[in-house]
Amino acid sequence: MDATRHSGLECLRIISIILIVSMHILGNTFHTGNWLNKEFILFINTLGNTGVTLFILISGYFGIRFNTHKFFKMLVVVWFYSIVSYLIETIWLHTPHTWTGLASSLLPILSKKYWFMTCYVVLYCFSPYLNRLVHNLSQKSYKQLLLLWGFFFVFAPTILFFEIQNDTGKGIINVTLAYLIGQYLKTYGLPENMK
């Protein structure tokens, strides 16, 4: 494990977390019909989603090292908060109880109740294989993989409105792409024309 401190990347990770938290707090605060509030929410959501991509990109740069104990600890934490949030919603906020809602809360990863945690858990499970894959590809093959992935899952839906995966960018496809880009940057650095 690399013991070198990367204070710039650590700071960027903190900024990405702040953007994500701001999106969730402010995005749920301004819900009037005012067009200015709608534009503000759109702006905050854009920043927050950028924060998600940055967070995964940095995770890719450092690489996820699978650890069974940490994996199960993460699952327990997600499950705990899922159950607690369900109880708060049904008991204190008087949200009607549904069997679907209960099942979703009992199986938050499989039901994709929290899209990011579902994606992160899947990425965490596949990380040993992704890490091995990228270290066995030549730089040229790695670039081709990223370009193909980017074309079909970023460029085509954004510019051509041709969406293969209907997840509006909030799914395992884009999370994996950001992770792979982070791994590429760690291995090969920035391309010369971007320095």
Language-model segment annotations:
Residues 55, 171, 176:
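Short, well-structured alpha-helical interface segments that form or flank functional binding sites
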Residues 106-111, 158-169:
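Membrane-interface helix caps and helix-loop-helix hairpins in membrane proteins
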Residues 161, 172-173, 192-195:
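Alpha-helical transmembrane segments and terminal signal-anchor/GPI-anchor hydrophobic tails
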Residues 175-184:
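Alpha-helical transmembrane segments and their membrane-interface exit regions
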Residues 185-189:
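Membrane-interface transmembrane helices that cradle and orient dolichyl/undecaprenyl
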Residues 71, 142, 165-173:
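Short, aromatic-rich membrane-interface segments at the entry and exit
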Residues 1-153, 193-194:
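Membrane-cytosol interface segments of multi-pass membrane proteins
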